[in-house]
């Protein structure tokens, strides 16, 4: 297994798919990285030469991925919460941030439903 950006990428898959195992690299970014590195998308990871691996590593190092990207996303969310913006308040309350309705759904964000005591007989 080759290690790129601190992540073991699978040997038996095509390089373009294997790079998507790195947080922050999807299929479009993976294709751009391989084009810039001059590596074919169809080649398997186990068939890469050392020079090709180094070229891919250089391209990936130029992009914010893994820990740096996670840290930036978390800092952005904390900043929104500190300035008291609508999005920050929604994050703080654990509600959907992007305008979804909460009357019926949003269970993923709100957590498990809590039963309310009904009318006693």
Curated annotation (Swiss-Prot):
Example GO molecular function: structural constituent of ribosome
User: Is tRNA-binding found in the keyword set?
Assistant: yes
Q: Which UniProt keywords apply?
A: Ribonucleoprotein, Ribosomal protein, RNA-binding, rRNA-binding, tRNA-binding
Pfam families from the xrefs?
A: Ribosomal_S13
Q: Which domain of life is it from?
A: Bacteria
RNA-binding among keywords: yes
| GO cellular component terms, A-Z | cytosol; small ribosomal subunit
Where composition is biased (Basic residues), the residues are 106-121
Q: Where does the record place the region Disordered?
A: 94-121
Q: InterPro entries from the entry?
A: Rbsml_uS13_C, Ribosomal_uS13, Ribosomal_uS13-like_H2TH, Ribosomal_uS13_bac-type, Ribosomal_uS13_CS
GO biological processes: translation
> From which residue to which does any coiled coil extend?
none
Provide the assembly information. Part of the 30S ribosomal subunit. Forms a loose heterodimer with protein S19. Forms two bridges to the 50S subunit in the 70S ribosome.
Q: Which family does it belong to?
A: Belongs to the universal ribosomal protein uS13 family.
Function according to Swiss-Prot or TrEMBL: Located at the top of the head of the 30S subunit, it contacts several helices of the 16S rRNA. In the 70S ribosome it contacts the 23S rRNA (bridge B1a) and protein L5 of the 50S subunit (bridge B1b), connecting the 2 subunits; these bridges are implicated in subunit movement. Contacts the tRNAs in the A and P-sites.
According to UniProt, the name of this protein is Small ribosomal subunit protein uS13
What is the species listed in this Swiss-Prot or TrEMBL entry? Streptococcus sanguinis (strain SK36)
């Amino acid at each position: 297994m080759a290690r790129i950006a601190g992540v073991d990428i699978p040997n038996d898959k095509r390089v373009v798919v294997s790079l998507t195992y790195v947080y922050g690299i999807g299929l479009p970014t993976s294709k751009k990285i391989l084009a810039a590195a001059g590596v074919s998308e169809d080649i398997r990871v186990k068939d890469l030469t050392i020079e090709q691996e180094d070229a891919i590593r250089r391209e990936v190092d130029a992009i914010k991925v893994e820990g740096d990207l996670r840290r930036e996303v978390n800092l952005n969310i904390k900043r929104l919460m500190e300035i008291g913006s609508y999005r920050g308040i929604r994050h703080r309350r654990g509600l959907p941030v992007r305008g979804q309705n909460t009357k019926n759904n949003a269970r993923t964000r709100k957590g498990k439903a809590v039963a309310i005591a009904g009318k006693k007989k």
